Amino acid sequence: MLKLIKVNDFVTKALAYEQRPTLYKLGTYMNRKNGKYILCDCSGLIKGILWGYPDKGRYCSNGVPDVNANTMISKCCTGVTSDMSKLRKGMAVWLNGHIGIYCGDGVVVESSPRWENGIQRTYPKGCPVANKHKLNTRKWSKCGYLKWIDYTSTSDLTQVAKDVIKGKYGNGKKRIDNLTKAGYNYEEVQKIVNSLLK
């Protein structure tokens, strides 16, 4: 049975696992350890979160199959584009044979043998948010919405819409930029703003 996870929960877990001691290991999904290090490959990061690893995981649970990075972007994502200015919080970012999670604020969490050899934060080249965290930069080819993630958390978006009405995000282009930088889809938020103002 397909069980969606809220985008904020998904991103929070990805950022939390980046803080734990990890090593990159092909074919693992946070289901094994090497000493204190949790082992994980790139698609295993996404699957591991969705399957409940490393703590109470169950292989292929929650309607999420065991697929690789290329299958994940081609068969398990919607709205796939090569335009990185369209990045939204919780989207998968992909290049041939590799995948990561865009967490908003110019941060991707990915598991890679490159740079830090494990789960790490990087910057997606072409992102509309500046690399203010001075992260290693990777050029991704595509991004898309994972079908296992609930990107429409109405209560969260309703609060954001209320904050927009109060002026927290500015007006005009500044509002669009600020919402995008915060990882929200401007059009979705604006629809809720319009409905609240009726």
Question: Residue ranges of each PLM-predicted region?
Answer:
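Repeat-associated, polar segments at repeat-unit boundaries in modular proteins
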Residues: 182-198
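Catalytic Cys-His active-site segments of thiol-dependent hydrolases/isopeptidases
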Residues: 101-131
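Loop/turn positions that initiate beta-strands
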Residues: 89-91
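Low-complexity, Pro/Thr/Ser/Gly/Ala-rich linker/spacer regions in secreted
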Residues: 1-4, 147-159, 198
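Extracytoplasmic/secreted envelope proteins and their assembly/folding machinery
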Residues: 7-14, 43-47, 157-161, 173-176, ...
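Extracytoplasmic Gram-positive cell-surface binding/anchoring modules and repeats
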Residues: 165-176, 184-186
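Low-complexity, Gly/Ser/Thr/Pro-rich intrinsically disordered linker/tail segments
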Residues: 129-155
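N-terminal capping segments
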Residues: 1-62, 96-98, 109-111
